């Protein structure tokens, strides 16, 4: 019996090839798009989930109630971690996590620039980075013990056993020996922690000088609480710790007008759940992704799948009119309601199976291109994940039940006598069809509006004046074994006579996100005239203002003609306002026991992303603070040739360093990569949603025209023109699209208004965006309808009325 249902279902699908293709192709596209978008969201939401003790691990951060506003920071002073563990038995393990004074690694004749991180021994007890070979109990037991990843072992040692081998790492001009005690398995690509080598935190730069200093924050701290200890309980204990170790800072903050929060505190030590750091703006370890984006991907995938389901439902209901006699005869012959439902549901099952198979094939073929376009690191293996398989099966069953079950249930309710006559109650069916079409175009209009607003915001970020000229400036990370000051001096001299090179300077901070992935800044705090001052700190070299085209408002720039400029600073406008001086030139700033003189004030420029407000900035030229980047301004014509000149010179100056130069405008664009990716996904989702909606609209319009063939013929005989016929067929559908636009407008405004709040600098949503989006939706719908209505209007009325 069931085989007979499937045979009939197959024949019906084969008989109505165009409708079958529209439904199967639309569903296949929807399945493929939903799967790819869901894989992206799954990857983002799976970050750091592989750690066994993830629920008990937290990152510490400060929240401070300054008079100038709230400040949050995840960087900690060196003595905090050991003091906290000694004070609180609820802390089972604690580790500091920082960069290293070393990066250049040497073994025999190999010298490589590797990612070296400094941690405490508890790190490998807290986090799940399994040891594949070597000492798994105390891998960092001795000061000069190190743990390397499998990838690092292969790069350094090839086929040799790395355990017990001695390697050297360079600090300044000297090399220090380390012993490999263990090899850790390579971390997955959904790990917030990345490293090639783990060494003891005692090798952190400036450790010896700052190990007892509480006012210099330069690394991150993670704690693992004992089982049963909640985050809130831990945070209730930390005020006593703050009052014990930060007495001077609390006094200074109160003196400057800091007001306590609801908890009565002006400075708090809080805990961020480790599984949230990938999505947190607080953490420096996380990628600063957004759960909003991940959830939006799931929402968009649901939208696309729902729109395809609506097409299926509407087409099934519409086709029931052409199959009314078949339904009636089956009822007369004794077919039960459940049998009719089984037959129609069987057709839906066949369509869904075909669509799923085709959709999986499309997703598999498009995955490499999808990864490239949207900067994803997904693999085909993710398709074999039990969670993904369950998601696909659940989606398949829901689609089949909804898209096939509802039309089958509706058709089975039709009156037997009326169906035999070929007459069906169209009122309720049309209401359902119209309601579903409205929902369909609400979702499509939402995606169109959101796409336009996201693109506007990104273009605003890209084109907003930054206070410096990012065009034609090359950013070159120094790296390598050479002293950074020496590398800068040699490259400057080497490029001095190149006509394509306009100026060369150095800095310890990149702008934007370079090819080396760095985008860090430094913070300093000090007292000035009994007032606490906090400022970002930037080490620059001579000609920085010239190279970056930054405006000097007052005073003078650093100059080699003045030998004492190494004891001077340049400040930005925001820093000048924080000092509270009408004329800050000549003011003396006391920092780490050194008096620094304000030489000049520069116009504010955005050295950080536009997500954040302009902050105070102090710039210094101090040879004992190494530079990490070289900035080179080049002639505006033939930029590739200029880059080749720089590359050739760099290879001569620093042959062992990797050439990772990039243009500053590229760096700033990378800063907004996630927004760019979101806009691309929105656009792709909008295009797919409109495409699938229009496929359904096309088919529904065709069925509506078939039902009204004789009416159209009679109207033509009575003198109706082609535009009148087109208007007759199109107006009801266009009205539904207009209703959808009206519904979508406030929803889109609310969603995008909240999204824009994550940017300090943002656009204002203009009314014309909604008008233009509505016009686009109406025009696309009208063109889709016209493809069929014009054809019907031009048809010979004799053909339409022949059966009469």
Regions found by a protein language model. Name each.
Residues 44, 53-112, 122, 151-159, ...:
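Hydrophobic, regular-secondary-structure patches
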Residues 16, 308-349, 696-734, 788, ...:
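Interfacial "coupling" helices/loops that link adjacent transmembrane helices in transporter permeases
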Residues 15-41, 289-325, 352-353, 432-457, ...:
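Hydrophobic alpha-helical transmembrane segments of multi-pass inner-membrane transport and secretion
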Residues 1-6, 11, 15, 19, ...:
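Membrane-helix entry/capping segments
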């Amino acid at each position: 019996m069931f085989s007979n249902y499937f045979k009939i279902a197959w024949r019906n699908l084969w008989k109505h090839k165009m409708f079958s293709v529209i439904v199967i192709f639309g569903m296949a596209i929807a399945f493929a798009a939903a799967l790819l978008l869901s894989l992206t969201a799954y990857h983002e939401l799976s970050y750091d989930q592989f750690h066994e003790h993830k629920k008990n691990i937290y990152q510490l951060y400060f929240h401070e109630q300054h008079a100038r506003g709230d400040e949050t920071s995840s960087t900690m002073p060196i003595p905090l971690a050991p003091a906290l563990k000694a004070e609180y038995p609820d802390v089972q393990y604690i580790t500091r996590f920082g960069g290293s004074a070393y990066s250049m690694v040497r073994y025999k004749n190999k010298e490589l620039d590797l990612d070296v991180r400094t941690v405490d021994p508890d790190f490998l007890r807290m986090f799940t980075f399994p040891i594949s070979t070597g000492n798994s109990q105390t891998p960092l037991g001795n000061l000069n013990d190190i743990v390397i990843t499998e990838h690092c072992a292969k790069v350094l040692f090839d086929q040799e056993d790395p355990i017990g081998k001695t390697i050297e790492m360079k600090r300044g001009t000297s090399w220090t020996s380390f012993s490999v005690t263990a090899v850790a398995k390579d971390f997955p690509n959904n790990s917030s922690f990345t490293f090639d080598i783990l060494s003891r935190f005692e090798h952190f730069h400036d450790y010896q000088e700052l190990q007892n200093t509480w006012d210099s924050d330069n690394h991150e701290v993670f704690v693992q609480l004992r089982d049963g200890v909640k985050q809130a309980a831990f945070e209730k204990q930390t005020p006593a710790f703050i009052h014990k170790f930060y007495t001077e800072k609390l006094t200074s903050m109160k003196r400057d007008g800091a007001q306590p929060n609801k908890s009565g505190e002006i400075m708090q030590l809080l805990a961020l759940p480790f599984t949230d750091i990938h999505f947190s703006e607080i953490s420096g370890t996380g990628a600063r992704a957004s759960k909003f984006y991940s959830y939006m991907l799931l929402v968009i995938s649901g939208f696309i799948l729902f729109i395809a389901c609506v097409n299926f439902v509407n087409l099934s209901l519409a086709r029931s009119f052409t199959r009314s006699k078949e339904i009636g005869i089956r009822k007369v012959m004794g077919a039960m309601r459940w049998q009719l439902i089984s037959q129609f549901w069987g057709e839906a099952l066949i369509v869904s199976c075909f669509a799923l198979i085709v959709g999986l094939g499309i997703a598999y073929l498009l995955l490499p291109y999808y990864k490239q376009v949207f900067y994803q690191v997904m693999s085909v293996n993710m398709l074999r994940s039990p969670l993904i398989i369950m998601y696909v099966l659940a989606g398949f069953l829901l689609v089949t039940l909804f898209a096939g079950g509802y039309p089958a249930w509706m058709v089975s309710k039709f009156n037997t006598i009326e169906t035999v006559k070929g007459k069906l109650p169209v009122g309720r069916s049309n209401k359902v069809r119209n309601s579903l079409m409205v929902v369909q175009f609400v979702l499509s209009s939402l995606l169109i509006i959101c796409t336009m607003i996201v693109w506007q915001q990104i273009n605003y970020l890209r084109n907003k004046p930054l206070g410096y000229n990012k065009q034609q400036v090359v950013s070159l990370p120094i790296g390598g074994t050479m002293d950074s000051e020496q590398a800068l001096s040699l490259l400057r001299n080497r490029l001095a006579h190149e006509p394509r090179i306009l100026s060369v300077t150095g800095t310890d901070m990149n702008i934007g996100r370079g090819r080396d992935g760095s985008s860090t800044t430094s913070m300093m705090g000090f007292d000035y005239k009994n007032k606490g001052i906090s400022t970002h700190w930037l080490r620059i070299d001579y000609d920085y203002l010239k190279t970056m085209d930054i405006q000097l408002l007052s005073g003078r720039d650093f100059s080699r003609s003045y030998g004492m400029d190494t004891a001077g600073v340049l400040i930005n406008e925001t820093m000048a306002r924080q000092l509270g001086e009408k004329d800050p030139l000549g003011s003396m700033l006391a920092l780490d026991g050194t008096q620094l003189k304000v030489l000049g004030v520069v116009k504010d420029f955005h050295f950080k992303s536009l997500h954040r407000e302009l902050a105070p900035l102090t710039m210094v030229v101090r040879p004992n603070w190494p530079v990490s980047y070289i900035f080179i301004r080049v002639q505006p014509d033939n930029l590739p040739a200029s880059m080749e000149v720089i590359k050739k010179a760099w290879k001569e100056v620093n042959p062992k360093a990797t050439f990772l130069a990039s243009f500053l405008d590229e760096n700033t664009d990378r800063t907004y990569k996630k927004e760019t990716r979101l806009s691309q996904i929105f656009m792709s989702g909008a295009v797919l949603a409109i495409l699938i909606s229009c496929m359904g609209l096309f088919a529904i319009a065709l069925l509506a025209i078939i039902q009204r063939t004789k009416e159209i013929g009679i109207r033509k005989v009575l003198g109706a023109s082609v535009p009148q016929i087109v208007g007759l067929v199109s107006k009801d559908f266009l009205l539904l699209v207009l209703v959808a636009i009206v519904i979508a407008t406030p929803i889109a405004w609310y969603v995008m208004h909240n999204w824009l709040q994550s940017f300090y600098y943002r656009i204002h949503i203009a009314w014309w965006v909604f008008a233009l989006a509505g016009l686009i939706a109406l025009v696309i719908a009208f063109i889709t309808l016209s493809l069929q209505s014009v054809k019907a209007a031009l048809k010979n009325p004799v053909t339409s009325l022949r059966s009469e």
